[in-house]
Amino acid sequence: MAAGSLALLQVAALLGFAAVPALAQASQSQPIRFPQAQYEPVDWTDLDGWAGDDHAAAFAAFLQSCRALNADRQPATGPATAKIATALKQVCARGLAAAPLEENAARKFFEHSFRPLRINKLGGTDGFLTGYYEPIIDGSRVPTAEFSAPLYRRPPDLVVSGRRPLGDVFPSKGVTVGRRVGRRETVPYYDRAAIEDGALNGRHLEICWLRSQTDVLFAQIQGSARIRLRDGTILRVNYDSHNGWPYTAVGRVLVARNIMPKSEVTMQRIREWMEANPEQAKDVRRQNKSYVFFRVVRLNAKDEAIGGGGVPLVPGRSIAIDRSFHAYGTPFFITADLPIADDKPVTKFRRLVFAQDTGSAIVGPARADIFFGAGDEAARIAGRIRNPGEFVILLPRALDPVAAARNIPLPPERPRVLAQFNVRTAVESTVHDVPLPQVKPVVASDAQPKIGRKP
C-alpha cells in the first residue's frame, strides 16, 4: 500500500470513520437542496490555496462552533439549515474526540468530513465580502456635557411573537416585533428618530453614555463594542435585540443623495463626514429606522467579542452570514484578493472560515462579513473591505447536494394517455402516412425520342 494511502487510513481510524470512496459515501447520504442558490461540487485540488492554509488553527476555530452546536444555543432557521446543523453535530463529535490535531491531521479531518461545494446566488458569478470589527469607544457611566448619547439595554416592553427568536435573522423574518398596547394589540416599536428624540427617557435603560449618536450608530452596526470609561476600565457590550424595523445602510443613503461617490464609501469616510456635518448626519442616520439594544458581557481584555452563534469570534476566521441560508458552525473556504495591507486589493485571502455571526446587511448565500478583531487597525482594514470573492461551502458528507437531481426519473417514451389508446405520435404518422410516388407507365419500345428528330 502506498505511504499516502496508509497515512489516510491512519487518520481516518483516528477520527473514528472509515476512509471509503466518495461514491460509496454519497449513496448513503441524505439529499439536501439550497433554495434560491446555485451550487456545484468541486474537488479539493480546485481550491486555490487550500493546501497552504493553517488547518490546525482552522480546526481550533471549528471546535469553538462545535461547543455551541452541542449546547443547542441557536435553533435552525429552515429545513436545509436544520439538516446541516444535525450533520455538523456528528462531525463535531468526531472532532472533539480527536482534538487536538496537528496540521496534516487537521487537513485530513476536513477533507474526510466534508465535501466542497461552490455556491452563489442564482445567476451570480462571485460572492461579496465586507469586514467588521469591535470598536473601542470612549464613554461614561453617567451623563455629562461631553458624553450625552445613551447606549440602551433591551426595553422590557419590546415583545416578539412568531416562529423565530428576535436575535436570529435581520430584519425580523417571520416574526412580529413591537410593543404591546392594551391586552392584545401589538404596534411597531419606536424607530431611531423617536428613540433619539427621547422615547425611552426616564426608564433607566441606559448602560452608559457615549460622546455622540455617531458613536452609538457605529457600535450598533458592528454589533459589539469596548467602552473605555473615564476611570480606565473597559465595559464590554454585545448585541441583545433590535426594534424590528428594517436596516438601511447609511452609506447607500449618502450615495443616493450624491453626497459621496460609491467608490469612496468606507466606514472611516462615513464617520469623518458625519462628524464634520452633524445636522446633515442626523437626517441621514435616521433613514436607518433600525435600532439595536445591547447587553453587558463579562469578558477579559484578551477575549474577542461574542458572535450570534454564542462563541468568541476569531479574527480572520469568523464570518457573519445570512442565517436563512446557512447554519452556525458551517465552514467555508473563501478565495479573494482584499485590500488588507493598504487600499489596493492585492492581499491574497485563501482561508477556511466559519459561520459564527450574523448581521442585518448580510443577505444571500454567497455574502459574508469577515471579523478582523478590535481596535483602530482592525477598523481600518474592515472599513476597506468591499470586494468580490469565491465561496465554497464545506458540506458534511452525510448530506448529498446532487441526490435530488440524480434521482429525477426519465420521462416515458410516449405519453401514457396516448399509449392507452394505441395512438401513433405525430412523428410516426408522418413517417408511415406519406404516400409513395406512383410508378410511371413504361414507354412503348418503338417510340423514338423527340431530341434530334427532324420534322
Positions of predicted regions on the chain:
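Bacterial N-terminal signal peptides
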Residues: 3-21
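N-terminal processing/targeting junctions
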Residues: 14-15, 23, 68, 139, ...
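Cleaved targeting-peptide boundary
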Residues: 20, 24-35
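C-terminal soluble interaction/assembly domains
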Residues: 27-30, 40, 51, 301-455
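Secretory/export targeting leaders with adjacent low-complexity proregions
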Residues: 36-300, 304-309, 453
